[in-house]
Amino acid sequence: LETDRMIDSWNRLLQNVLPNEPNLIVLPEICDQYYNYPVPRRHEYYEVRGNRVRDFFMEKAYKNSCHIAYSAVRKMDDGTFRNSTQIINPRGEIVGIYNKNHPTIGETEEDNILPGKDAKVISCDFGKVACAICFDLNFDPLWEKYKPQSPDIILFSSAYHGGLMQNYRAYRLRSYFIGSIIDLENTVINPVGQTIAKSTNYFGYVTHDINLDYK
């Protein structure tokens, strides 16, 4: 029932952006979690949820011929967890997974979420994307790994806005930056660090066209 409610909620929310026929939808950090749940109940929910929400987004990506950046907690075979962004292509396939490199102390100590160690760009039909989650925004080593890979777009799923660090990372990597933030301003930033689109207090989503042929 909890999983059904979550899927129904996202099905309604996606109707705000799907009429614009997007090539890419970026979802906020841990987008299918009930944030008011204590840790034990949260872990019970993950067991019941399994991959059902992921499969829902895979079906949506396929039916609407778009990429979806799906951020969620994943349980690993050893019983530990990762805070991950999974990139789904228009054929409904997972083409890459990024594990948050810099989880918070609360995540590691309470939720048993371990840090990822890789920072590899993921190839999509339109170009290369670099993923980052929440506090990753503040740690230079991650971004120095990404810089020589020349990503076209940075996908930032977060519960934390980060302020001007968003613009700085876009400028430093000379990359577009898309910020999808829980209950805060969502942004599209160009490769020179200018915010070119953002959500408002009236609408919690933003759609925008960007030109990846500018180089």
Predicted segment positions?
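Histidine-/acidic-rich catalytic cores in large beta-rich domains
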Residues: 22, 119-120, 207
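CN hydrolase (nitrilase-like) catalytic-core segments centered on the catalytic cysteine
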Residues: 49-69, 137-215
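Active-site catalytic loop in hydrolytic enzyme cores
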Residues: 76-149, 164-165, 172
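Short, flexible loop segments at the rims of nucleotide/cofactor-binding pockets, characterized by
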Residues: 2-5, 45-48, 106-111, 130-135, ...
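A generic "cationic amphipathic patch" detector
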Residues: 38-39, 74, 98, 105, ...
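Structural motif
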Residues: 23-24, 127-129, 153
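Active-site-proximal beta-strand/loop segments in catalytic clefts of secreted hydrolases
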Residues: 28-30, 71-74, 101, 133, ...
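Cys-nucleophile CN-hydrolase/nitrilase-fold catalytic domain and related Cys-dependent amidase chemistry
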Residues: 3-91, 172
